[in-house]
Amino acid sequence: MLDNYEIDRFGVIHQIDVTPIKYDKQYMSYYEDLSDRTIKLGYQRLGWVLGITGEIPRSVLEIGYGTGTFIEAAKITGVADCAGCDITRFPLPKGVRFVDWDEALAGMWDLVAMFDVLEHIPDLSFLARLQARHLAIAVPYCRWRELGADGDAWFETWRMRLPNEHLHHFDRESLVALLADNGFECVTLNGFEDGIRLRPGEAGPNILSGFFRKPHPKIRRLRNKA
């Protein structure tokens, strides 16, 4: 493993010493310049969610909404309660309310979406407080463990490592294990976003998408008894 990184009991790789970056207008300008792609991603992600659940959620919270393309797609589709939470109060589409971090964790949500977000949040313990029926996530796909002896060399040059910005790195097993420890069951994992996001000549997998659900408390109690 590279210097300044460690692996936890779930297999998640964490940067140890961090110099925080600023998530400001200049940072957001990169994504605004990719507006055509981000709009497509917003609708692609919503279609993925609706295809799994077979229903329109009653409430959606997007943590780290950025340019707001996903939460706007949810609002247009007919989600009654749409909310966004971000480190900076970026503009939100009409009809979408802003909630701060405490409000986000205090609320109860049909769906919480975190696309390209989990890897940025310093303290992942908030997952234990998240009250969501469903959870949709996209993170960079870390192949360090998969590549074995070649993992360090790959990790050192991986364009998505982004020290001080991407603080945690996940593969399929570690993402599932982390969320299971916080009460979320994996429904499906895939790499569908690579169809839009891979650069010319680049080979995947590059983005790992996961959909999770939190079982009803009665179901959890029955499973624990079994």
Q: Language-model segments: which ranges?
A:
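Residues lining the SAM
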Residues: 115-118, 138
